[in-house]
Amino acid sequence: MTDQEHSASEENADSVEKHKYMRKIRSFVKREGRMTNRQQTAIDTLWDTMGIDFEEKLIDFNALFGRQAPIVLEIGFGMGKSLIEMAKNAPEKNFIGIEVHGPGVGACLADAGEAGVTNLRVINHDAVEVLDKMIPDNSLAVFQLYFPDPWHKARHHKRRIVQPHFIENMRHKLAIGGVIHMATDWENYAEHMLAVLQASPDFKNTSESDYAPRPEWRPLTKFENRGNNLGHGVWDLLFERIS
């Protein structure tokens, strides 16, 4: 997400916060945009095989994929290019992607279908509700959160998805030995992520320093490449569930 998009998110949030009827804090602003014909066609033709409808029922991953394999779950996959590349490069794993942006879901399905990816399923819904209602405890091998909205302004920090209660929820969803992998290009958010993870006695940092080098399995995005060329930093965090 660009700085301009981040600013737009914050402006939208300022407006939303004025409404007293808002029942809960959300970590995202849902901007649907225009669905292209290609994206809509992908949803119409591929949803039955690659899409998962939201329901208050735990997913049976073995039945869903027709096999038993490590589950990698990613929240906020955007247009899905990195997620598809990871799924292609790790056919021995099963991937679940959660995204609230409809056109992004359509783009992901279209690209995954063209690439012949079969070990990927997507959910178009609020990730927090999906985690609470659909993801079994102790079921995930890896949880991925790449470049979430940093909510720059201090008064919006409460909207950041990475909070102590969120990490505690992820502790339940990850199996012992499972890994949380986060990445951000916003240093203040990286420091926030690090502080929240370090405060949990149930996780340990897999890196000898605070932040880890980008692992080879996380593809570079166009945005990240552009930032690297401009000298902008990117911070990866990998923490393992130990209890």
From Swiss-Prot:
GO MF annotation list: tRNA (guanine(46)-N7)-methyltransferase activity
InterPro entries the UniProt entry points to: SAM-dependent_MTases_sf, tRNA_(Gua-N-7)_MeTrfase_Trmb, tRNA_methyltr_TrmB_bact
SUPFAM superfamilies: S-adenosyl-L-methionine-dependent methyltransferases
GO cellular component: tRNA methyltransferase complex
Recorded catalytic activity of this chain's protein: guanosine(46) in tRNA + S-adenosyl-L-methionine = N(7)-methylguanosine(46) in tRNA + S-adenosyl-L-homocysteine
UniProt pathway annotation: tRNA modification; N(7)-methylguanine-tRNA biosynthesis
Pfam hit, one: Methyltransf_4
UniProt-annotated binding residues for substrate: 153, 185, 221-224
UniProt EC number: 2.1.1.33
Task performed by this protein: Catalyzes the formation of N(7)-methylguanine at position 46 (m7G46) in tRNA.
NCBIfam families attached to this UniProt entry: tRNA (guanosine(46)-N7)-methyltransferase TrmB
Annotated protein name in UniProt: tRNA (guanine-N(7)-)-methyltransferase
Organism encoding this protein: Psychromonas ingrahamii (strain DSM 17664 / CCUG 51855 / 37)
